[in-house]
Amino acid sequence: MNDGWFERRTHQWTEWTPQRLVELKRDTGTTVSLVVPARNEEATVGRIVSRVREELIGRVPLLDELVVMDSDSTDATAREAAEAGARVHRTVDVRPDLGHHHGKGEALWKAQFVTGGDVLVFLDADLVEWDTHFVSGLLGPLLQDPGVELVKAFYDRVLDREDARPTHEGGRVTELVARPTLALRWPALSGVVQPLSGEWAIRRSLLRELTVPTGYGVELATLVDTHLRRGVDAIAQVGMGLRGHHHQSLHGLGAMATELLAVADRRAGAGPGADAVELHQYGTGGKTMTTEVGLVERGPASRVGPPPDRPEGPCAREVAGRC
């Protein structure tokens, strides 16, 4: 673990009131976009959007825009989000000239083309135990210290089990894949409590320079790449208290783990060169289940030209959207 980093860069959300954050936001001239990537989350996304709009746009003007990126949903996710007051973009419709890939990382990468904030805050759409400080708390280190460029949330997790007691453990993939990988390859990041947390914030100026995996590897890749490009002190973390969300099956986590290992291998110079691999898993009686795991990574958004129907040259930079 990097000497002294944990003490310097670990915070609690209670250190900043929303009113204080608004003052810092005004003093620094910073604009903030909240992005909620969602796929088939009709049961939760509307409540999340409504609550955030009420507290962080209506009660205090902390957010400049709230965008839901609908990632190939087959349910009413888009309708629920729009009716709750979000601006909704279907990922497949954003910059169609650049093609489309399935996955969370694709939604976050494409969000750069439909948002305008200096800071992007990402919030998962499947939360069931949470509050709006999951958003506001992430902004404290960024608004207070210009040297901070990436902020990760950490929390006590409420697991889907009968006793429902909070635990300091990370998720299964965090404890079995991400944390050991960091310990072996990037030990300076071992102090990051929740390296795969879906709640994080980043300066646009940094994100637009990063390569972004289109799937679940986006959080690990962003963490490692920030460390490699800016140093560990550009990263901070904020404790948020309790967090509850829906969990994937063990087989589903196998695909996630595969993506994370690919992210780590690429950043360690060990490959892989393929855009996808086949993951073979086994069920009852040795029944074979084969999943194609996508390993595509999007290049830096800063290198992407304007859409074919727009002229070359700078566009007006508005919080309502970007060219």
What do these predicted ranges mean?
Residues 64, 78-106:
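Conserved donor nucleotide-binding strand/loop of the catalytic core
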Residues 70-79:
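A conserved acidic beta->alpha catalytic loop
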Residues 1-7, 51, 250-323:
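Terminal low-complexity segments of carbohydrate-biosynthetic enzymes
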Residues 124-130:
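The conserved acidic donor/metal-binding loop of glycosyltransferases
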Residues 168-263:
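Conserved catalytic loops of nucleotide-sugar-dependent glycosyltransferases that act on lipid-linked
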